[in-house]
Amino acid sequence: MRRRRRFAFALPLVIVVALVLALGVSTGSARSHRQTDAFKAAWIYVGPHDDHGWSQAHDKGRLYVQNALGSKVQTTYKELVPEGPQTCQVIESLVRDGNKIIFATSFGFQNCMVTEAKKHSDVFFEQATGTAQAKNLAEYFGAAEDAIYLSGMAAGAATKKGVLGYVVPFAIPEVIRHANAFALGAQVTHPGAKVRLIWTNSWLDPSKEKKAAQSLVAAGSDVLGQNVDSPATGQFAESKGVPWVGYDSDAHTFAPKQWLTAAVYNWGPYYLRRVKAAMDGTWKTGFYYGSLKDGFVGLARYGPKVTAKTKRMIAAKKAALLSGKFYEFAGPLHDQKGKLRVKKGQRLTVKQLYAMNWLVKGVIGSAKG
């Protein structure tokens, strides 16, 4: 059954997403212990909890909390929640149900999180990839750009033409810095490599992602990467014999021959700390930015096409990142048009990364989407 479900993934998901968008409703689900005295914690996902990507990585974090705390906590999730005003309705429902901490896992949920945090001072709110804080609203993310840079090295080592394709969702700073990191990593193992972008304007749309992958290969890309949520790019890559770098989760089963690696997140330990803090009264607002050092981000397993030499190069670069001797966004760095964006000796701060609106030299595409 599991094998059949994997290969049937793309079409049903397209149908479900289309229905959700057309009807203007969100799909809710829960997996929890039902003790009435248990502390209640909730997660909101933009995709299905089993998307084999972003939302599934968060749901693994939720399960980590549930398994660690057992009957002391009741965890709930809402999936396929549209970004926009409807998010507020979902949050209101979760508050009415007695949830005392709510994790919103997509940038487009932020406006409603800010609104609802003001209305419910007795509830703790946590916004992933966000830019807003309040007394009862915290933000959290991690330096995925470091892991993406390393995955880009694997991609660069796999290309023969020196042209890689990268399927990207929205032209926002988060995605732009990730695309830049991927390109800079690829240029280490394949100097002069070009990375061509195609924007889908959706976090999760397998049909658009597959079409983007097809277009990238047709335009000459011989390696594919992604910053979107489904494994559709990888399924296409496997069918065409094109090496593939995933994102968010280990999805090697969708492309066992062409899989290289992926930047992945380990949300569980952070979620556990925050739920415990909410339970014992020590929760405080703030900004958390996880790293390679604390294990929040990392690389998934390598596929068969990644050579021992490439693995050694990636390991050495990872060690340099961990020690602080290397940083991918240290100057000099030039943009697509040759303009110096980061001077020699300068290192971009997290604040500057959060405002990044330009693409590095070698990236083909527009930073405006």
PLM regions and their residue ranges:
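Short, low-complexity disordered leader/linker segments with a strong preference
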Residues: 1-39, 367-369
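A residue-level marker of the well-folded mature domains of exported/periplasmic proteins
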Residues: 31-369
